[in-house]
Amino acid sequence: MNLERVSNEEKLNLCRKYYLGGFAFLPFLWLVNIFWFFKEAFFAPAYTEQSQIKGYVWRSAVGFLFWVIVLTTWITIFQIYRPRWGALGDYLSFTIPLGTP
């Protein structure tokens, strides 16, 4: 999609939809929102809706960073402690590795 062909009001509407969609446990939408609208929010000539778009881009970045931290922490903890959790660790695993922990 070429954002240059879309009206400023439509840009704001699209940015808002991606921002709200990220709350449905879809942090990838926040990443898309950041990439699509970063230049529009911070480098384009000023217009009425730009301050709202800037807010959505910042909040999308914070939400995406939060999810990256949470998922990285969980993956690290799970990889380190899964063998110690015994049956629970096996229950949470999709595949059970062979060998001894």
Swiss-Prot record:
Matching InterPro entries: Gamma_Secretase_Asp_P_PEN2
Intramembrane residues: 18-36
Intracellular or extracellular location(s): Endoplasmic reticulum membrane; Golgi apparatus, Golgi stack membrane; Cell membrane; Membrane
Major site of localization recorded for this protein: endoplasmic reticulum
Coiled-coil annotated spans: none
Keyword Transmembrane: yes
GO biological process per UniProt: amyloid precursor protein catabolic process; amyloid precursor protein metabolic process; amyloid-beta formation; membrane protein ectodomain proteolysis; membrane protein intracellular domain proteolysis; Notch receptor processing; Notch signaling pathway; protein processing
Record membrane topology: Multi-pass membrane protein
Function: Essential subunit of the gamma-secretase complex, an endoprotease complex that catalyzes the intramembrane cleavage of integral membrane proteins such as Notch receptors and APP (amyloid-beta precursor protein). The gamma-secretase complex plays a role in Notch and Wnt signaling cascades and regulation of downstream processes via its role in processing key regulatory proteins, and by regulating cytosolic CTNNB1 levels. PSENEN modulates both endoproteolysis of presenilin and gamma-secretase activity.
UniProt family annotation: Belongs to the PEN-2 family.
Protein's name in the database: Gamma-secretase subunit PEN-2
